[in-house]
Regions:
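Bacterial Sec-dependent N-terminal signal peptides
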Residues: 1-25
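Non-catalytic cap/lid and distal C-terminal segments of serine-dependent acyl enzymes
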Residues: 21-268
Length: 268
């Protein structure tokens, strides 16, 4: 797949809403929070575990990108991840899921650490600063969260997979669990310098997933990155890479594998 058509797919898939009925669980609520770093107001989706209402338990928190596609078919373009239905069905382990809506036309800017010579972007530092300095303190103050590094994750797909990977190096004492699906490492190859130039917390857990029928760069790019990580000290115990035969770049791939990743990241 050529990069031009690939980027067009990304833009359309995350910028157009469908008109189907809402499928969001009753355990999902939303609120808005100012994001001064991005000069906008962000809509935030929060999934609370079933036991939240009847206990005083505290829970791990996973921050996820592209909230429009996580919980509700009505707000997604080509299908949802069904995060809420999946977690409602399993019981334990339980976690709070915080979804951050993407910025529409600004999505590329927000989710890319380095600019592309053609597609621009490169403002992920501002986006992550909003999560760490504004959103996370709000969540930790208003919900019964476990705020420490080992109980805080960040998770996304495509450009969301890229920025989740980047967050592990930008905030190595904040995010202990990284879910990186179909990461867009092709966007700027400076991302491969990151493990060499930035210190990684050795306890950080990474779960990577790609499909063999995504863009032609996806599988070799991930394999290259894993070799870079290994050379720079990442323990084999702290990462998992799954290559899905026939998997395509879409919500079906990511939804089908979400629970497996969730279990692995939360396993103590």
């Amino acid at each position: 797949m050529k990069l031009t058509s690939f980027c067009l797919f990304l833009f359309l898939a995350f910028s157009i809403n469908s008109f189907s009925q809402s499928t969001a669980s009753p355990n999902v609520t939303t609120f808005e929070l100012e994001a001064p770093q991005l000069d906008t107001i962000k809509k935030i989706w929060v999934y609370l575990p079933e036991s939240y209402k009847t206990s005083e338990n505290k829970y791990p928190v996973i921050y996820m990108h592209d909230a429009q596609n996580l919980f509700d078919r009505e707000t997604s373009y080509v299908g949802e991840w069904k995060v809420d239905e999946s977690l409602d069905s399993i019981g334990k382990p339980e976690a709070i899921i915080v979804g951050i809506e993407h910025g529409g036309a600004k999505r590329i800017d927000e989710l890319t650490p380095f600019p592309h010579e053609k597609y621009g972007g490169g403002k992920a530092d501002d986006y992550l600063e909003f999560i760490v300095q504004n959103l996370k303190p709000y969540i930790d103050s208003n919900y019964r969260s476990l705020p420490d590094y080992s109980n805080t994750g960040i998770f996304g797909s495509s450009l969301g997979g890229l920025v989740s990977f980047y967050a592990a190096f930008k905030y190595p004492e904040t995010f202990g669990m990284i879910g990186s699906y179909s990461p867009s490492f092709w966007f700027n190859r400076d991302i491969y310098k990151l493990p060499k130039n930035e210190k990684l917390n050795p306890e950080t857990k990474f779960y990577f997933l790609v499909g063999t029928k995504e863009s032609e760069e996806m599988v070799p790019d991930l394999r290259e990155m894993i070799e870079v990580l290994k050379k720079n000290g990442l323990s084999s115990e702290n990462f998992k890479a799954k290559y899905v035969e026939g998997g395509e770049h879409n919500e079906a791939l990511w939804s089908d594998n979400f629970l497996v990743t969730y279990f692995w990241l939360l396993k103590k």
